[in-house]
Amino acid sequence: MTRVKRGVVARRRHKKILKQAKGYYGARSRVFRVAKQAVIKAGQYAYRDRRQRKRQFRALWITRINAASRANGLSYSRFIAGLKKSGIEIDRKVLADLAVHEKAAFAAIVDKAKAAQ
């Protein structure tokens, strides 16, 4: 039986990691051992931040809604409570978009929330 050398397999594995590390600074894109660690860490950051992105956007929407509703004379918590009582089911993403781009429409929604209280 012939001897199997692992040169081809190792080179393919190294090339794969170095390709993933393309664009990294210094040894992180050139040295296999360092590049492998950098790619693993990048994957961990990506996994974590895909979840954090959802939280951060929700926080941003709430901040925008709060600012716009206070400009119309109502705090965020009272505004959301008023929406629930009046049966308006618009999610925070859409409310934040209205607050930024359609100020008149948002003001009308705030008036409905005020009336419900």
Swiss-Prot record:
Keywords, sorted A to Z: Ribonucleoprotein, Ribosomal protein, RNA-binding, rRNA-binding
Gene3D superfamilies from the UniProt entry: 6.10.160.10, Ribosomal protein L20
Superkingdom of origin organism: Bacteria
CDD domains: Ribosomal_L20
Keyword Membrane belongs to the record: no
Pfam family, one: Ribosomal_L20
Ranges annotated as spanning the membrane: none
One function term, GO molecular function aspect: rRNA binding
An annotated GO BP: translation
GO cellular component, one term: ribosome
NCBIfam families membership: rplT_bact
HAMAP family linked: Ribosomal_bL20
Similarity comment text for this entry: Belongs to the bacterial ribosomal protein bL20 family.
Entry function: Binds directly to 23S ribosomal RNA and is necessary for the in vitro assembly process of the 50S ribosomal subunit. It is not involved in the protein synthesizing functions of that subunit.
Protein name: Large ribosomal subunit protein bL20
Gene symbol of the encoding locus: rplT
